């Protein structure tokens, strides 16, 4: 009987590491819309367990055929621990190092919850806010932008002025994107916006609370232009913010369109 000769394993070819002859570099290549559990620290000293959607890209030099897609997922799996601005910077650096890239980009979108107390009854409920961390790195210099969508109430000053009673009001989305130096709490951004709105909104209100928020908005009317200017004025005074973009969209209750305003500034 002839002895069994073990098969010789052939090396697996690394196709993406081959040279590319077209001599065209790629600005961004990577993975898009991958969901991953994360833990986000909050201002009260706790943390929230949530699920984020990630986009992760790097540049690719003209002489490489492809990037190493699996390494993006490996990096995510290594960062299941608490996500902060600091750890987000570390993730950017690690991604560039692992993929031998000159520049990198990570976006992380997730719901963030804040426990709010109704203004009169003091009943508590959760409010959700859409948060995005955007990281850009070139060389070893990461830049972090934090974006928060804050729903508020807006009431029209013109409608109040010309009407014998009442004024049209609506829910608005104020989107604040700040490029930060150091650290900023998400709640700091949320509080700033809600303080400048006609009135903030709540997950749960009793009748005395409804009366309060209705009258509060009526006493504090604001155009969409007022909203972005008032938020921008606050951001101008915040040394943690090196650049910002403020957008406000009013979902008009008397029209089938929205009112919109935006201010963008490098400080």
Swiss-Prot record:
Keyword Membrane: no
Record's keyword terms, sorted: Hydrolase
GO terms, biological process: tetrahydrofolate biosynthetic process
Reaction(s) this enzyme catalyzes, per UniProt: GTP + H2O = 7,8-dihydroneopterin 3'-triphosphate + formate + H(+)
Pathway of action: Cofactor biosynthesis; 7,8-dihydroneopterin triphosphate biosynthesis; 7,8-dihydroneopterin triphosphate from GTP: step 1/1
Pfam families attached to this UniProt entry: GCHY-1
Site (May be catalytically important): 156
Source domain of life: Bacteria
Single GO term (MF): GTP cyclohydrolase I activity
NCBIfam families linked to this entry: PRK13674.1-1
Classification via PANTHER family: GTP CYCLOHYDROLASE MPTA (PTHR36445:SF1)
Function: Converts GTP to 7,8-dihydroneopterin triphosphate.
Family to which this protein belongs: Belongs to the GTP cyclohydrolase IV family.
UniProt-recorded name of the protein: GTP cyclohydrolase FolE2
Originating species: Nitrosococcus oceani (strain ATCC 19707 / BCRC 17464 / JCM 30415 / NCIMB 11848 / C-107)
């Amino acid at each position: 009987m002839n002895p069994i000769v073990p098969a010789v394993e052939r090396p697996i070819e690394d196709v993406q590491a081959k040279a590319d002859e077209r001599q065209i570099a790629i600005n961004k290549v990577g993975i898009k819309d991958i969901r991953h559990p994360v833990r986000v620290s909050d201002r009260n000293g706790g943390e929230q367990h949530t699920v984020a959607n990630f986009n992760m890209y790097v540049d690719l030099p003209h002489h490489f055929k492809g990037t190493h897609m699996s390494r993006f997922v490996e990096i995510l799996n290594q960062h299941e621990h608490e996500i902060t601005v600091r750890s987000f910077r570390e993730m950017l650096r690690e991604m560039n190092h692992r993929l031998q890239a000159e520049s990198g980009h990570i976006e992380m979108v997730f719901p963030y919850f804040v426990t709010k107390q109704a203004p009169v009854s003091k009943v508590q409920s959760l409010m959700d806010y859409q948060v995005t961390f955007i990281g850009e790195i070139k060389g070893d210099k990461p830049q972090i932008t934090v974006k928060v969508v804050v729903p508020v109430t807006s009431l029209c000053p013109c409608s109040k002025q010309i009407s014998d009673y009442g004024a049209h009001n609506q829910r608005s989305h104020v989107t604040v994107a700040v490029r930060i130096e150091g650290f900023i709490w998400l709640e700091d951004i949320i509080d700033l916006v809600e303080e400048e709105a006609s009135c903030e909104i709540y997950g749960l209100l009793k009748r005395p609370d409804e009366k309060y928020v209705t009258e509060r908005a009526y006493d504090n009317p604001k155009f969409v232009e007022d909203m972005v200017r008032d938020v921008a004025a606050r951001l101008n005074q915040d040394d943690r913010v090196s650049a910002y973009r403020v957008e406000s969209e009013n979902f008009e209750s008397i029209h089938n369109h929205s009112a919109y305003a935006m201010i963008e500034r490098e400080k």
